Amino acid sequence: MVPQTETRAGAGFKAGVKDYRLTYYTPDYVVKDTDILAAFRMTPQPGVPPEECGAAVAAESSTGTWTTVWTDGLTTLDRYKGRCYDIEPVPGEDNQYIAYVAYPIDLFEEGSVTNLFTSIVGNVFGFKALRALRLEDLRIPPAYVKTFQGPPHGIQVERDKLNKYGRGLLGCTIKPKLGLSAKNYGRAVYECLRGGLDFTKDDENVNSQPFMRWRDRFLFVAEATYKAQSETGEIKGHYLNATAATCEEMLKRAQCAKELGVPIIMHDYLTGGFTANTSLSSYCRDHGLLLHIHRAMHAVIDRQRNHGIHFRVLAKALRLSGGDHLHSGTVVGKLEGEREVTLGFVDLMRDDYIEKDRSRGIYFTQDWCSMGGTMPVASGGIHVWHMPALVEIFGDDACLQFGGGTLGHPWGNAPGAVANRVALEACTQARNEGRDLAREGGDVIRSACKWSPELAAACEVWKEIKFEFETIDKL
C-alpha cells in the first residue's frame, strides 16, 4: 500500500485519528529554494517509529493537530504543511535520529523571528511521543532573509565609526557586577578606557536597581567615556544596558543614550525577547547607535545535548533580529564551547555565505544575501595568557572581553587594561609576521613582558589559572 502523502479535499471528511506519517512523512519531497529547513535531533519514546516522530514534529510545528478536522478541506493543506523529508540515525547513539523538516515560506510572517520560533520551537517540544527533541540548525532561505533588516550597522560600519582596523577590539565587564554606586562605576569605566581598552560593559544583571539607577549610571559613564577619549585620542564606548521591564522603558533609555552621544548600547536578547530586540535594533539603526547583545539565559536553552535549541540557531536568529555584537563563548575560558562547534556559529554570525559542514555542526548552506555581520564577543574567564589562542581562533573581527582579567590586575584597573592592550598588539604583530601563535604564543607573551611591566605583573598573577573541564555539547 502506498502511503497517503497528499491531502485531497475531494476525498471527503473521515473523522478519527490517523498516523502522522501518512500525511507528513514525505521522503520523495524535493526541497524548494524558498523552504525553511530545520534539522531536529529526536529521541523517540520506546516503541515509536522514527518516521512517526519525524512526521509528528513536522505536523505539530506547522498545520497538524492530534485528530482529523473537517476544516482541512477548506484549505490547500499541501501548500502549507511541513514535511519530514529525511531521517538519519545519529552515529554512536542508540535511538537518536536527525529529522529534516521543510516548511513552506508562507507559514511565517515577514521579518518576525518571534513568529518563526513560535511555530518551529513551540508546542512540539512537549510532545509525548518524544523523549527529547533538539533543534540543531535552520536554513533561512534568501527569500525570507530579505524580509529582515539584520544588524543595525554590521562589522564594517562599526569599524568605520570607531576608526579602528587591523586588530581585534578589547572590552571589559565592570566588576563587581552589582553593588557599585554610579560614580564609582563611572570611575572604573574611565580607568579601563584610559588604560587602552576600546569598550567597557554593563553586566547583563545591571538594569536599574536601588543601588544604581539607570540614568545616574548613564550620566557618569558618558562623562568617563568622553574624558578617556579626550586623553587618548581614540574613540571609546561603554555598553549601556537598555534592557528594561517594558519596551517603552527600554526605548526611553536608548533615547537617553542617543542624546548623551554615546556610540553603543546593550540588550539581553533572550530574557528581553525577540520582539523587544527587533524594536531596539530598528531604533539603533535609525539613530546611529551600535547594539551589543548579551545571551543571558542561553545555557538553559542550548546546553543539553539532547533537548532544546543549539546556540547556532539562536545566533542565526539574533543576526536576523538585529545585533552588532553577540557573546559567543571563548573556547579557552570558563564557559562551555568546543572549538569546531564555536567556530561554526562564529562564521554564521560574521560571514555572508557559509557552506554546509557537518564537521563543524553546520547542517545547511546559509546565504545571508549581503546582510551585515554580527561581531562575536569572547568573554568569560580569559586573561593575558589566553591572548595568543584568542587571536588565533577568532582573528581580527571579534571583541575580546576581559572582566576579571582587567580589574583583577594587582596594580589596578588601568594597568590591567594596559596589559591586555600590549598582549593583543604583540600577538597581532606576531601573527602578521607569520609566527604560529598556537605553538609560539607563550614566547610572544613572555617577550612582550620585557618592555611592559604591567603585562609582566598580569602574567605572574594568572600563570596557574586554567579552566580544564570537558565540553558537554560535542559533535
From Swiss-Prot:
<keyword id="KW-0503">Monooxygenase</keyword>
<dbReference type="InterPro" id="IPR000685">
    <property type="entry name" value="RuBisCO_lsu_C"/>
</dbReference>
<dbReference type="InterPro" id="IPR017443">
    <property type="entry name" value="RuBisCO_lsu_fd_N"/>
</dbReference>
<dbReference type="GO" id="GO:0000287">
    <property type="term" value="F:magnesium ion binding"/>
</dbReference>
<feature type="modified residue" description="N6,N6,N6-trimethyllysine">
    <location>
        <position position="14"/>
    </location>
</feature>
<comment type="similarity">
    <text>Belongs to the RuBisCO large chain family. Type I subfamily.</text>
</comment>
<dbReference type="GO" id="GO:0016984">
    <property type="term" value="F:ribulose-bisphosphate carboxylase activity"/>
</dbReference>
<feature type="binding site" description="in homodimeric partner">
    <location>
        <position position="123"/>
    </location>
    <ligand>
        <name>substrate</name>
    </ligand>
</feature>
<dbReference type="InterPro" id="IPR020888">
    <property type="entry name" value="RuBisCO_lsuI"/>
</dbReference>
<feature type="binding site">
    <location>
        <position position="204"/>
    </location>
    <ligand>
        <name>Mg(2+)</name>
    </ligand>
</feature>
<protein>
    <recommendedName>
        <fullName>Ribulose bisphosphate carboxylase large chain</fullName>
        <ecNumber>4.1.1.39</ecNumber>
    </recommendedName>
</protein>
<keyword id="KW-0560">Oxidoreductase</keyword>
<dbReference type="InterPro" id="IPR020878">
    <property type="entry name" value="RuBisCo_large_chain_AS"/>
</dbReference>
<dbReference type="Pfam" id="PF00016">
    <property type="entry name" value="RuBisCO_large"/>
</dbReference>
<feature type="binding site">
    <location>
        <position position="177"/>
    </location>
    <ligand>
        <name>substrate</name>
    </ligand>
</feature>
<keyword id="KW-0456">Lyase</keyword>
<feature type="active site" description="Proton acceptor">
    <location>
        <position position="175"/>
    </location>
</feature>
<comment type="function">
    <text>RuBisCO catalyzes two reactions: the carboxylation of D-ribulose 1,5-bisphosphate, the primary event in carbon dioxide fixation, as well as the oxidative fragmentation of the pentose substrate in the photorespiration process. Both reactions occur simultaneously and in competition at the same active site.</text>
</comment>
<dbReference type="Pfam" id="PF02788">
    <property type="entry name" value="RuBisCO_large_N"/>
</dbReference>
<keyword id="KW-0150">Chloroplast</keyword>
<keyword id="KW-1015">Disulfide bond</keyword>
<feature type="site" description="Transition state stabilizer">
    <location>
        <position position="334"/>
    </location>
</feature>
<dbReference type="GO" id="GO:0004497">
    <property type="term" value="F:monooxygenase activity"/>
</dbReference>
<feature type="binding site">
    <location>
        <position position="295"/>
    </location>
    <ligand>
        <name>substrate</name>
    </ligand>
</feature>
<feature type="propeptide">
    <location>
        <begin position="1"/>
        <end position="2"/>
    </location>
</feature>
<comment type="subunit">
    <text>Heterohexadecamer of 8 large chains and 8 small chains; disulfide-linked. The disulfide link is formed within the large subunit homodimers.</text>
</comment>
<dbReference type="InterPro" id="IPR033966">
    <property type="entry name" value="RuBisCO"/>
</dbReference>
<keyword id="KW-0602">Photosynthesis</keyword>
<keyword id="KW-0601">Photorespiration</keyword>
<keyword id="KW-0488">Methylation</keyword>
<keyword id="KW-0934">Plastid</keyword>
<keyword id="KW-0113">Calvin cycle</keyword>
<feature type="binding site">
    <location>
        <position position="173"/>
    </location>
    <ligand>
        <name>substrate</name>
    </ligand>
</feature>
<keyword id="KW-0479">Metal-binding</keyword>
<feature type="binding site" description="via carbamate group">
    <location>
        <position position="201"/>
    </location>
    <ligand>
        <name>Mg(2+)</name>
    </ligand>
</feature>
<feature type="modified residue" description="N-acetylproline">
    <location>
        <position position="3"/>
    </location>
</feature>
<feature type="modified residue" description="N6-carboxylysine">
    <location>
        <position position="201"/>
    </location>
</feature>
<keyword id="KW-0120">Carbon dioxide fixation</keyword>
<dbReference type="GO" id="GO:0009853">
    <property type="term" value="P:photorespiration"/>
</dbReference>
<keyword id="KW-0007">Acetylation</keyword>
<feature type="binding site">
    <location>
        <position position="327"/>
    </location>
    <ligand>
        <name>substrate</name>
    </ligand>
</feature>
<dbReference type="GO" id="GO:0019253">
    <property type="term" value="P:reductive pentose-phosphate cycle"/>
</dbReference>
